[in-house]
Design a protein with these regions (language model features):
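Basic nucleic-acid-binding alpha-helical/helix-turn surface characteristic of O6-alkylguanine DNA
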Residues: 1-117, 164, 168-170
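Major-groove recognition helix of helix-turn-helix-like DNA-binding domains
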Residues: 96, 121-129
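…primarily DNA-binding HTH/wHTH and HhH modules…
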Residues: 144-170
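Short clusters of hydrophobic/aromatic residues that line enzyme substrate/ligand-binding pockets
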Residues: 76-83, 123, 148-151
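Short Lys/Arg-enriched helix C-cap and helix-to-coil transition segments
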Residues: 134-141
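Active-site phosphate/pyrophosphate- and oxyanion-stabilizing loops and adjacent acidic/basic residues
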Residues: 41, 124, 159
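Flexible interhelical turns and helix-capping residues at alpha-helix boundaries
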Residues: 100-103, 127, 131
């Protein structure tokens, strides 16, 4: 099996994209080589053996990212993604895709949306396991007090992503 890949320079640092069959299967901010290696290990665990082939625009994700960072907050919404996770993770990730740009949701509200209102920490863990952040917008989930909460790509990136979408967070 072949996985298409590309490194895209963004205002928030380099992002490595992975796609197969027209769908994005992985995305990671790869300012540290260890992050890229960790994502490739996760992909192998879910997809099995594969070879990487560098292409310009895997599954159109580079074009979508460029449009997003050029000011179109909806550019990432239509991207086809292929997700692999537990049934709970998949439910959380589906709900994340329903949060529109410029809006945020608390971890508790997201837990309620997946019919697991007491699973707030599990929602946070599912967010942290999101293999295609930005396209499955886990950065739109914030703490109940309105603070940023967490973000695997770093809180400075999360704040900047929300600002790009017109949302200011304390």
């Amino acid at each position: 099996m072949t996985i298409e890949t590309a490194v895209v320079q963004t205002p928030l640092g380099p992002v490595t994209l992975y796609a197969r069959g027209g769908a994005l299967v992985g995305l990671e901010f790869t300012d540290r080589a260890a992050r890229r290696a960790a994502l490739e290990r996760r992909l192998r665990r879910h997809l099995g053996r594969f070879e990487l082939r560098e292409v310009r625009d895997p599954a159109g994700a580079r074009s979508a990212l460029e449009a997003y960072f050029a000011g179109d907050p909806h550019a990432l919404s239509g991207q086809q993604v292929e997700l692999h996770g537990t049934p709970f993770q998949l439910a959380v990730w589906r709900e994340l895709r329903c949060i529109p740009p410029g809006r945020t949701l608390s971890y508790a509200a997201l837990a309620a949306r997946v019919a697991r209102p007491r699973a707030v920490r599990a929602v946070g863990q599912a967010n942290g396991s999101n293999p295609v952040s930005l396209f499955v917008p886990c950065h739109r989930v914030i703490a109940a007090d309105g603070g940023l909460g967490g973000y695997g790509g770093g809180l400075a990136r999360k704040r900047r992503l929300l600002e790009l979408e017109g949302r200011t967070v304390a």
